[in-house]
Regions:
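Glycine- and charge-enriched low-complexity intrinsically disordered segments
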Residues: 544-548
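Non-cysteine beta-strand/loop elements that form the S-adenosyl-L-methionine
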Residues: 71, 289-309, 398-409
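Acidic (Asp/Glu)-rich catalytic clusters
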Residues: 253-255, 282-292, 371-373, 394-396
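Divalent metal-binding segments
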Residues: 2-7, 11, 15-279, 299, ...
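Short proline/glycine-enriched turn/loop segments at secondary-structure junctions
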Residues: 285-286, 522-527
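His/Asp/Glu-enriched, well-ordered alpha-helical/loop segment
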Residues: 338-348, 352-378, 382-383, 388-392, ...
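A structural microfeature
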Residues: 31-32, 534, 543
Length: 548
């Protein structure tokens, strides 16, 4: 079916034709974008007998949002977890978990009761991590796990520690990733790679059930105008089912059951896993189809700022006994990046602290030096704490910045305390990235934050939190055009899709949305209240909430 779009303010993200009033869709692609008069002329020359008119009623139309880094499967699974976001006291965390246990937990299920989203910085009673003792008040017979909002810290009760194999006798095996008390007894707090391994250890649905969950969840994103995501999911799949699930996702894209475009950021933190992926399974960034593909290899170099596990070069300003946690030393990270690079596959590395970012930049520099004729689009995910020299190295090494503007909502209240005023003054420097020509793609890290793009756009253009507090480094404010580009065309570039999506332009996928608010001209506060009214993928409406 063909569509003639009329009566819309179209923000195209195409610098050669930034605004339009009409477009024609044929066969799932934009065939024409421009003025209404020229659209009429185009249709006279290229008749479309089956064409229908989409009268947008003067609404704002733009490309569908592209979240450049999230955890889609984790979000889908988290809908069945106990929601601990917004807890303002440790006692409230325990109360919500107790209610979840009493009201919805089935002891015969063999599953763990999971809670997600707490943040000790918001507690008004005790500003500390929960412990096993706290969770043991609920039950010691069945396994409980609660994860901090950053998902780099978790807390197990006694039963969960027993099942996973954490005890006083084994604690030393896990190093700094398992906390112990003064007696050397684990207190239930687990971090980083141990928590990641626990996620894979948990009892899980079958591969087919996971696929059903992913398909059923896509409507949540369509309601918010998201048509594409770049998602880190592999560690949320049963280890023995990863390749089955990848195959099912590819098949679901081919059959049309999966409409959301997913570019997998394949988390493969061990050399053996990467080798199996590349050489035994023969998977690379050509795997997939128009809907599901592999876009890059994903690695993690450190933890989170809120939990003080992000790796810093100097001790934390507010915790001088720690610099955070390094997942790799330089040689180990170099080896992984080099293996992907020589296969011309991009690597996107989670790095928040300036210490981790330095490791990443060094690894990319070495790979480019060894194989200068290859140009995979390496990137750093989060890239929050930086100094001026590191900001320059992003451009020098052609490293992508995957940023999450919504992080300002929380981080502006802690960053100076965590890293000191001098280093904070060159951090979250998104305008510096863009002005220097660094490809800067926006995302949310959902479910760390909500996947809703509009709050992130608000933070990007105001540098304030969602209550209007701020601004933090006002000189780093972005224009509306820059913010919308970051959530559309820049994300397409990050997944090697800039030729087919991210813009309203002839020859590109007809993935577009309409909103009841002009995002280019409305007051900043109105960004938080704008509504997506329609979402289209391949010229087909997948969400419609038009009220007139």
């Amino acid at each position: 079916m063909s569509i003639w779009i009329q009566n819309a303010k179209i923000a195209t993200m195409d610098s050669a034709n930034p605004l339009a009033e009409s477009a024609v869709v044929v066969g799932g692609f934009f065939a024409f974008v421009g003025s209404l008069q020229n659209a009429e002329a185009y249709l006279q020359e290229h008749p479309c007998p089956d064409i229908s008119v989409l009268d947008c009623g003067g609404e704002f139309l733009m490309p569908g949002f592209n979240d450049s880094h999230m955890h889609y499967l984790h979000y889908a699974k988290s809908k069945s977890s106990v929601d601990l976001t917004g807890c303002t006291a440790l006692s409230e965390v325990i109360l919500r978990m107790r209610r979840g246990f009493e009201q919805s937990y089935r002891p015969d299920s063999g599953l763990w009761l999971i809670g997600e989203g707490w943040n000790q910085d918001y507690f008004t009673d005790e500003k500390r991590f929960p412990t096993a003792d706290d969770l043991n008040e609920i039950t010691t017979e069945y396994p409980l796990l609660i994860m901090r909002s950053c998902f780099h810290i978790g807390v197990l009760n006694q039963k969960a520690m027993e099942l996973y194999g954490i005890s006083a006798d084994t604690a030393s095996r896990f190093g700094a990733c398992v906390e112990t008390d003064a007696r050397g007894i684990p207190n239930g707090v687990v971090k980083e790679e141990v928590l990641d391994d626990i996620k894979s250890f948990l009892p899980a649905p079958s591969a087919q059930q996971l696929l059903d969950l992913l398909v059923d969840t896509q409507t949540d994103l369509f309601r918010n105008g998201i048509t594409s995501v770049q998602s880190d999911d592999l560690k949320y799949m049963p280890a023995d089912s990863v390749y089955t699930i990848l195959s099912l996702l590819r098949e679901a894209g081919e059959t049309g059951r999966l409409r959301l475009r997913i570019a997998e950021q394949a988390l493969l933190p061990q050399k053996s896993e990467l080798d199996q992926f590349l050489y035994e399974k023969g998977i690379d960034d050509s795997y997939g189809n128009r809907t599901f593909k592999i876009s890059c290899i994903k690695l993690l170099a450190d933890g989170s700022l809120g939990a003080r596990t992000a790796l810093m070069r100097k001790p934390y300003h507010d915790a001088p006994d720690t610099k955070g946690l390094a997942v790799y030393d330089q040689a180990s990270l170099d080896a992984l990046v080099l293996e992907a690079h020589k296969n011309n596959i991009a690597v996107a590395i989670h790095a928040i602290g300036d210490g981790a970012i330095e490791l990443c930049l060094n690894a990319f520099a070495r790979a480019r030096q060894e194989y200068p004729y290859l140009h995979p689009r390496h990137g750093i995910v989060h890239c929050q704490i930086t100094d001026a020299k590191q900001l320059r190295r992003f451009k020098e090494l052609d490293v992508l910045a995957y940023i999450q503007p919504i992080f300002l909502d929380y981080d502006i209240h802690i960053v100076t305390d965590r890293v000191g005023r001098e280093l904070a003054s060159t951090s979250y420097a998104w305008k510096t990235y863009i002005d220097s020509g660094v490809h800067t793609a926006f995302g949310t890290d959902c479910p760390v934050e909500s996947f809703r793009p509009l709050p992130g756009i608000y933070c990007a253009v105001t540098r304030c939190d969602l209550k209007g507090n701020g601004p933090f480094l006002a000189e780093q404010r972005l224009t509306r055009e820059q913010a919308l580009y970051g959530y559309t065309a820049a994300g397409a570039y990050a997944s090697h899709d800039e030729a087919v999506k991210g813009k309203i332009k002839a020859g590109m996928y007809a993935d577009f949305i309409t909103l009841d608010t002009d995002l280019l001209t409305c007051p900043a506060e109105a960004l938080l209240h704008a509504n997506v009214t329609r979402t289209y993928i391949d010229g087909t409406c997948v969400y419609n909430n038009v009220q007139r």
